């Protein structure tokens, strides 16, 4: 079976590695162009490119798949099926129609829930207790195609987007190589999604991470985990950004101004008034400094009153 693979970030490498280990012929790996990264803005290849070159696979890095010349290049590879894992661009019909078996996509949610670009963050923000991964066949819509297989996992109360995303793509890679042979033989009945049950996530922006202290503490605590590693949950003190790396809900009947530090926890961490309950700042990162305990940060703040905003 001739496979064309589309993916970009580190967690997409799990699927590429699994396909190579299973002995499939990868006729091409399509990934995003090298981009400037890091403080020195050095041109950096996507992790999938690094993995593909290590496997000796041909790599394509088009700026967009909408270019007709790119479409013809993909067609010339004569793939039987495509596999997509967080490539970073919705595939248009001209691309979708190239492989006879279409494109299979690994999506880190239990579709039709949490379609779109940020399903893991969406599940954490919503306080879900279970999530999972879906193998589905792409159609021209956004994560709306029929389902081949799903696997469910518990979503622990301390789950963070970065590690959970990696875990789900590992699981998805395993599920993919299990179902791919049966799919190719026509032994899997595709299950249409119930579009009436669909929920959709949005692309995150940096400002999404700014904390509104009038929100309930439980919502802000979820933000610290859902927005890790990016855009992070943050606030400001004396005009400087303060990232909230880890936090805990602290029940209180106090009625201070939201954002005001109203005391210390048993561990010495600051307790911040929110719209409902207080939030214990367990770990924070001041601007241009390393992460530190909330207690250490509070000890270095010399002010009779602290209000974050």
From Swiss-Prot:
Name used for this protein in its record: Methionyl-tRNA formyltransferase
A Pfam family of this chain: Formyl_trans_N
Reaction equations catalysed: L-methionyl-tRNA(fMet) + (6R)-10-formyltetrahydrofolate = N-formyl-L-methionyl-tRNA(fMet) + (6S)-5,6,7,8-tetrahydrofolate + H(+)
PANTHER family: METHIONYL-TRNA FORMYLTRANSFERASE, METHIONYL-TRNA FORMYLTRANSFERASE, MITOCHONDRIAL
Similarity annotation: Belongs to the Fmt family.
EC number(s) stated in the UniProt entry for this protein: 2.1.2.9
Class of this enzyme: transferase
Keyword Transferase: yes
Residues involved in (6S)-5,6,7,8-tetrahydrofolate binding: 109-112
InterPro entries: Fmt, Formyl_trans_C, Formyl_transf_N, Formyl_transf_N_sf, Formyl_transferase-like_C_sf, Met-tRNA-FMT_C, Met-tRNA-FMT_N
A single GO molecular function term of this UniProt record: methionyl-tRNA formyltransferase activity
Keywords: Protein biosynthesis, Transferase
GO cellular component: cytosol
Role description: Attaches a formyl group to the free amino group of methionyl-tRNA(fMet). The formyl group appears to play a dual role in the initiator identity of N-formylmethionyl-tRNA by promoting its recognition by IF2 and preventing the misappropriation of this tRNA by the elongation apparatus.
The keyword Electron transport is annotated on this UniProt entry: no
């Amino acid at each position: 079976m001739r496979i064309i693979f589309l993916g970009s970030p580190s967690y997409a490498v799990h699927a590429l590695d699994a396909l190579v280990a299973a002995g499939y012929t990868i006729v091409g790996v399509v990934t995003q162009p090298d981009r400037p990264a890091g403080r020195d803005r050095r041109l950096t290849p996507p992790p999938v490119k690094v993995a593909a070159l290590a496997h000796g696979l041909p790599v394509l890095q088009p700026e967009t798949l909408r270019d007709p010349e790119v479409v013809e290049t993909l067609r010339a590879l004569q793939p039987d099926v495509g596999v997509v894992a967080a490539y970073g661009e919705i595939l248009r019909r001209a691309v979708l129609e190239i492989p006879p078996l279409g494109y299979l996509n690994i999506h880190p949610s239990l579709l039709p829930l949490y379609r779109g670009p940020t399903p893991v963050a969406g599940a954490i923000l919503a306080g879900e207790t279970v999530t999972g991964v879906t193998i589905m066949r792409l159609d021209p819509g956004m994560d709306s195609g029929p389902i081949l297989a799903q696997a469910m996992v518990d979503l622990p109360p301390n789950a963070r987007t970065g590690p959970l995303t990696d875990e789900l793509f590992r699981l998805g890679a395993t599920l993919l190589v299990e179902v791919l042979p049966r799919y190719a033989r026509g032994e899997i009945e595709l299950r249409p999604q119930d579009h009436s049950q669909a929920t959709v996530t949005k692309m995150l922006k940096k400002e999404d991470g700014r904390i509104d202290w009038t929100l309930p503490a439980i919502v802000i605590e979820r933000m610290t985990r859902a927005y890790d590693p990016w855009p992070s949950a943050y606030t400001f003190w004396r005009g400087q950004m303060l990232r909230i790396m880890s936090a805990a809900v602290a029940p209180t009947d106090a009625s201070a101004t939201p954002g005001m530090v109203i005391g210390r926890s048993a561990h010495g961490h600051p307790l911040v008034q929110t719209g409902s309950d207080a939030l214990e700042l367990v770990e924070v990162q001041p601007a241009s400094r390393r992460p530190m305990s909330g207690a250490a940060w509070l000890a270095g703040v010399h002010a009779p009153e602290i209000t974050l905003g």
